Curated annotation (Swiss-Prot):
Enzyme class: transferase
Binding residues for substrate: 47, 196
UniProt keyword terms in alphabetical order: ATP-binding, Kinase, Magnesium, Metal-binding, Nucleotide-binding, Thiamine biosynthesis, Transferase
Single Gene Ontology BP annotation: metabolite repair
Transmembrane parts of this sequence: none
Source organism per UniProt: Brachyspira hyodysenteriae (strain ATCC 49526 / WA1)
Name recorded for this polypeptide: Hydroxyethylthiazole kinase
């Protein structure tokens, strides 16, 4: 096991031992899925959109997850308030710019949150990351039309410009701080046909941010997803059985197997 892999191993182990409270402002489609995933890996999720609660909640939460999947004017206001409060309290947050590039509102919302509040990690698919880096690319709703390798330079640019870590999901996941690049292999072809897999990656990134620096947190989350996804696919006949097996595999996670999936 390399030094990097040992760091991933220890970070996941620490997250499980600390069971951090993760405040999620996520989308309505995946809320139950991501809450169950966080519980399965050992974290403690809370889902609240109410601005009046943020001061109290972010005083006890270890990290914040902001996911723009189901945007409304009310949710946009809540996201800005949550990020502002998190910054004030030094609570790290991860942003998932779901569907950036699909509509002007989504793109603007994501860019505003990045520029104004400096997320520790931006986690998205290749198309979303390329759009946020200023590249012109057609998107297909919330799904990517680009492969992860196409987005590497965009990810580096975005990371350097905003002093953040960019995590790009694909057949091989790429994580970069603008200089260092990490690769995570594994997962399953059944993951893209299950709603919420990217959002789950972001939620687990939030859990890992509670105990790790942003680069290790982002890589650890993708290692967890890759390991659980690959193992679940071997026990599944299709998307429905995979969804159940995936949560089970998160719960039974082989930390050693997960950590060994990362390389530089």
């Amino acid at each position: 096991m390399s030094t990097l892999q040992e760091e991933i191993f220890n970070s996941i182990k620490e997250m499980k031992s600390k069971s951090p409270l993760v405040h999620n402002i996520t989308n309505f489609v995946v809320m139950q899925i991501t809450a169950n995933a966080l519980l399965a890996v050992g974290a403690s999720p809370v889902m609240t959109f109410e601005k009046e609660e943020f001061e109290d909640m972010l005083s006890i939460a270890s990290s914040l997850v902001v996911n723009i999947g189901t945007l409304t004017k009310t949710s946009i206001e809540a996201m800005h308030k949550a990020c502002e409060t998190a910054n004030k309290k030094n609570v790290p947050f991860v942003l998932d710019p779901v569907g950036a590039g699909a509509t002007k509102l989504r793109t603007k919302t994501a860019i505003d949150l990045i520029k104004n509040y400096n997320p520790k990690v931006v986690r998205g698919n290749a198309s979303e990351i390329m759009v946020l880096a200023g590249e012109s690319i057609k998107t297909k709703g919330v799904d990517s039309t680009a492969n992860v390798n196409m987005a590497l330079e965009a990810g580096k640019h975005l990371a350097k410009e905003y002093n953040t870590v960019v995590s790009i999901s694909g057949e091989t996941d790429i994580i970069t701080d603008g200089n260092k690049v990490l690769y995570v292999s594994g997962g399953s072809p059944l993951m893209p046909v299950n709603t919420g897999m990217g959002c789950t990656s972001t939620a687990i990134t939030g859990a890992m941010l509670a105990v790790s620096n942003p680069l290790i947190a982002a890589a650890s989350a993708m290692c967890i997803m890759a390991s659980a996804g690959e193992k679940a696919s071997k026990k599944s006949e299709g998307p429905a059985s995979f969804a159940v097996a995936f949560i089970d595999e998160l719960y039974k996670l082989d930390i050693n197997d997960a950590a060994n999936r990362v390389k530089e």
